[in-house]
A protein has these predicted regions:
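Exposed, interaction-prone extracellular/peripheral surfaces
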Residues: 2-45, 58-63, 72, 81-117, ...
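N-terminal juxtadomain amphipathic helix
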Residues: 65-67
């Protein structure tokens, strides 16, 4: 009964782990920085490349017609197809806010709950695609860091920390500081080296000049997705 009363207000570990069994009809292979907006569990605006372009060759029977390069075909008068190499696995870094400003929402769920759901969705999608998952979970007072790993147990630990910080949220908490987004990004800027994916999950309250500088530095050699709750 108590769990039903708290549904949408607080998350549970079992609730987050269920995302591992849900269909995830999106890609985490963006070709450029993407700013997405998420409501509940529905993600939009994330477009992926999936494969890296390698070379062009003349079409032969059996080639995938979806890869025909129509510009080259028109120019030469002969059908040409683009050849792709599958991308390597990479680190997917989740930066999850459980700040006091996230303890607000609609009748359906709190923003803090939506952020937790989003993190679970991305984490299990990354595992499905063979990527490694790391995370920084932060609130107004603390930052918890998890190294990137392809282990499901690592994701369970991340979800456990999200649940813990989520249950610290209270309506009467008066700490309205900017939180630890800048500190979280500072940690990541030294870890996300090249071709990693960084997913920022939260509201805009924690953003400041320091955070913006770190994001610019990270985005120079990595992909960054912002999920605004």
């Amino acid at each position: 009964m108590m769990e039903n009363q708290n549904e949408g207000v607080y998350v549970t570990l079992s609730e987050l782990l269920r995302f591992g069994y849900m269909p995830k009809n999106f890609t985490i292979r963006p070709s450029a920085a993407v700013l997405s907006k998420l409501s509940g569990r529905h993600l939009s605006g994330v477009r992926g490349r999936g494969m890296d372009f390698s070379e062009m060759k003349q079409y032969v029977q059996g080639d995938d017609t979806r890869n025909i390069d129509w510009k080259a075909t028109r120019r030469t008068g002969k059908p040409y197809v683009r050849i792709y190499n599958e991308e390597r696995d990479r680190n997917v870094w989740l930066v999850i806010s459980q700040m006091n400003s996230m303890f607000f929402g609609s009748k359906e769920r709190m923003k803090s709950v939506s952020a937790a759901h989003t993190a679970a969705l991305f984490a299990f999608k990354a595992l499905e695609t063979g990527d490694r998952v790391g995370a920084v979970v932060y609130n107004n007072e603390e930052v918890k860091f998890f190294k990137a790993s392809s282990s499901k147990n690592n994701v369970v630990q991340i979800m456990t920390e999200i649940e813990r910080q989520n249950h610290l949220l209270k309506a009467d908490n008066t700490n309205n500081s900017k939180g630890n987004l800048s500190e979280s990004l500072k940690i990541l800027s030294s870890l996300a080296k090249h071709d990693d994916l960084v997913v920022l999950i939260g509201d805009a309250r924690a953003m400041d000049e320091g955070s913006a500088r770190h994001i610019t530095r990270i985005n120079a050699h990595n992909d960054v997705i912002g999920v605004i709750i």
